[in-house]
Amino acid sequence: MAELTTIARPYAKAAFVFAKEHDALEQWEKMLGLAAAVAGDASMRAYLDQPELDDATKVSAFAEVCGDELDESGRNFVAQLTQNKRLPLLPIILQLFHELLAEQQQFTDVEMISAFELDDAATDKLVAALKKRLGTEVNVTTSVDQSLIGGVLVRAGDTVIDGSVRGRLNRLAEQLNS
């Protein structure tokens, strides 16, 4: 996954810079969201993976599915991704675009996964600690994963803070095995 993120990052940055220069960040966010959904669709992937199709046909089909939501610059972006065999990276490109957008707006998108539902006081305390550590405001998305056993797993961009019991047990097992 880290390798795919590294490959996708220049595309996300190029899209972000272009959108910012043309005052179209919101429009590009919507376009990339739709394009990522289309690229992530199993039937569309199967169609685009056909080796007998040339790049122009793939781009045309992709643009037709996206409809009017994909403007000329978006179509050119999709064409470049298709030519470089990077179209499957669109969901990662969208994620990185969101991170760049949040960074520009002085926000960091944070995913907090806990073993059990957190009450408001615990969430507020964690948000305050994250604001201090990251140095920005945070947009928090919370979810529950009981397989963590206890504790919290936090993802903020490329940073992962694993304070879960499962993570501690895994680290302990690694130490015992080495």
UniProtKB/Swiss-Prot annotation:
It is found in: Cell inner membrane. Keywords: ATP synthesis, Cell inner membrane, Cell membrane, CF(1), Hydrogen ion transport, Ion transport, Membrane, Transport. The keyword Ion transport applies. Transmembrane segments: none annotated. It comes from the Bacteria. GO terms for molecular function: proton-transporting ATP synthase activity, rotational mechanism. Pfam families: OSCP. GO terms for cellular component: plasma membrane; proton-transporting ATP synthase complex. It is a peripheral membrane protein. Belongs to the ATPase delta chain family. F-type ATPases have 2 components, F(1) - the catalytic core - and F(0) - the membrane proton channel. F(1) has five subunits: alpha(3), beta(3), gamma(1), delta(1), epsilon(1). F(0) has three main subunits: a(1), b(2) and c(10-14). The alpha and beta chains form an alternating ring which encloses part of the gamma chain. F(1) is attached to F(0) by a central stalk formed by the gamma and epsilon chains, while a peripheral stalk is formed by the delta and b chains. F(1)F(0) ATP synthase produces ATP from ADP in the presence of a proton or sodium gradient. F-type ATPases consist of two structural domains, F(1) containing the extramembraneous catalytic core and F(0) containing the membrane proton channel, linked together by a central stalk and a peripheral stalk. During catalysis, ATP synthesis in the catalytic domain of F(1) is coupled via a rotary mechanism of the central stalk subunits to proton translocation. This protein is part of the stalk that links CF(0) to CF(1). It either transmits conformational changes from CF(0) to CF(1) or is implicated in proton conduction. This is ATP synthase subunit delta. The lineage of its organism: Bacteria, Pseudomonadati, Pseudomonadota, Gammaproteobacteria, Oceanospirillales.
